[in-house]
Amino acid sequence: MNETNNTSLLPVSSLPSGLLPVGFSCTVEKFSVTVKRYLAEGGFSHVYLVQLVFPGKPPFEAVLKRIFATDAMALRAVHEEVRTMKLVSNQKRCVSYYGSEFFRTSKNQFEVLVLLEYCPCGGLIDFLNTRLQVRLSEQEILKIASDVTEAVAVMHYLKPPLIHRDLKIENVLLAAPNSYKLCDFGSACHPIPGAKTAAEAKQLEYDIEKFTTWQYRCPEMINVHKGFGIDEKSDIWALGVLFYKLCYYTTPFEHQGLAAIMNVSYAFPTFPPYSDRLKRLISTLLQQYPWQRPNIYQTFCEICKMRNVPIHIYDIYNGKNVSSCNPSGSEYLQHASKLENSGIHQSKSSVFPQPASAMKPMASPMLPNVNSMPYLSNGDHNNNGNTSSPVSRFSYGQHTSNVPSTQKLPSNFRVTQGAPPSHTYGPPPPVQPKPKISPTTPRLSTLALADDMFSSTAKETVPTNEAVFTGDVKSFDSQESNIIESEPLSASNASGKPRTSVNRLVDRYNHTSSLNKVAAAPAPVPKPVNLKSVENPQNNISAPTPSSLQSSNAPVGLGEVESKSVPPTNMATERGVVGRRASMSIAVNARRVSKPEKEHTNPNAEQGDVIPEKPMSIKERMNMLMTKTDYEKPKVEGYGRYTDVQQTKK
């Protein structure tokens, strides 16, 4: 192996580009290599079956892996994979490593030749495809689980430990029938501490996305902002997913996605049937938090107990369920309290575990015992304040989390059985009485608000039994003021019922309408004598009188113009509008001058007589306003927008 940190010292590659032809020979370290056939292709590699010749030994078959590194970072990753394979090469449950060579193809491109053990029986995924009709038995599953767990234990037992990070069915090979080996150590690394800054979290997410498969990712890989590190417990979770797929040929979170992984939401199918003990083993491995999962020794012991075979590895954990980066037992409480106040967490619910239910202890005494749980979550207390007793949480087709741990909680964290945890707080602050707020002005009734809205600027004077409003009346005409002052009060209430705003409004309207009839009645017109045509003066448009609205060729009497001129007061009260709305009506009528209004004539009256418009009642006026038939927005500009719709339709 010519591994070196200085890439410029690497020899230039003499290998042909593309696929290596059959019979091609080269030298890798002390082995003479001859290509026999092409096997497979990876993302940046080609795999060949070759024959090795070593001095003093008979030829044997091996695998040549030709890896292409497109930059220095990729070359460094290949270096790490080769070093990992050297560490685990002598173990019978891992694929053996024979040698490697590094070459330089250009300034920034490299290629590496790696010799590995050849497994003639293919991969585990190929073996599962041959058993689609007849599924694996429980003993076959336990044999595969035992070999893979032993291979992972070899990595976890190193100092410092290595984590595989990409445990899956595709990375298990069959060296011989009923003999399985773990391969593909390109994703292996040492334990990674939890991210403390946003930059560290972003880098950790990038590594997880690059070196792991999402179906086998643990919850702390999905959400790195929780602050949990990536250590041996991530491999424990991946083993649980792998065992589940051996049973049911699918991963537990295949269809639900990443959210199901975060919530540990999955179910056990009813077919094929397996023992409750095997399902409890899978459930123990698939725990939400790292400290809830067993270590690799506890997992291997349980599998050996189920297979009824001796345990041939020793316990380096001394009976403790610990890991490199994540706390266990009571240490988790202190760890969670620190993470709660850090800037990485998004919410309190992302720190503390979900309410969990208890699980029956497994047969192996080395696995976590639920009777010594480190603490009880809020969901473990019933409504009566008593803690729920440990019951079996397993049932077909369902899954709930359990809280396994071998660590005992310190006395200051223990919860008294039979009563929920109590907290001591200081005396509550005295309750300050709310100050009473008295309104500066009384609330107005609905009718009063309507009157105020329809008035111009000030509140309209309404005759009542109370004192008459004596505000500013300078804007009123003298005639209007006399009408209002001489208006009789509605004191004669024959019915004896209380007068309302509507009754007072009706009385006022009827009274003013009768006065308007007298004031608007035209003077007696003498018979026209010595009629002659008089042109209508053009400068007379400023006075909106009926005479100015007549045709210029119409014959009128000399004294008729003065008699037919209606004073502004009568115009303001033309429809019974009184009070301060008179000034508004005058302004509106002034804008109607340019467009003549249709006169109401009596067929029996003499020519030139003008019949005053019939006053409109409140009911008719309100109906017109509610049905919006009074005026509508015209399609023309100018003064035509004020055209009466009813007259236009005629």
UniProtKB/Swiss-Prot annotation:
Annotated transmembrane regions: none
SMART domains reported in the protein's UniProt record: S_TKc
Keywords: Nucleotide-binding
Record-level GO cellular component terms: actin cortical patch; cytoplasm
GO biological process: actin cortical patch assembly; actin filament organization; regulation of clathrin-dependent endocytosis; signaling
Keyword Transcription regulation listed: no
Gene Ontology terms, MF aspect: ATP binding; protein serine/threonine kinase activity
Record region (Disordered): 344-442, 517-571, 591-616
Record field: compositional bias (Polar residues): 369-415, 533-554
PROSITE patterns: PROTEIN_KINASE_DOM (PS50011), PROTEIN_KINASE_ST (PS00108)
Domain Protein kinase: 33-315
The keyword Nucleotide-binding is assigned to this record: yes
UniProt comment concerning the protein's domains: The protein kinase domain is predicted to be catalytically inactive.
Name this protein carries in UniProt: Protein kinase domain-containing protein ppk38
Organism of this sequence: Schizosaccharomyces pombe (strain 972 / ATCC 24843) (Fission yeast)
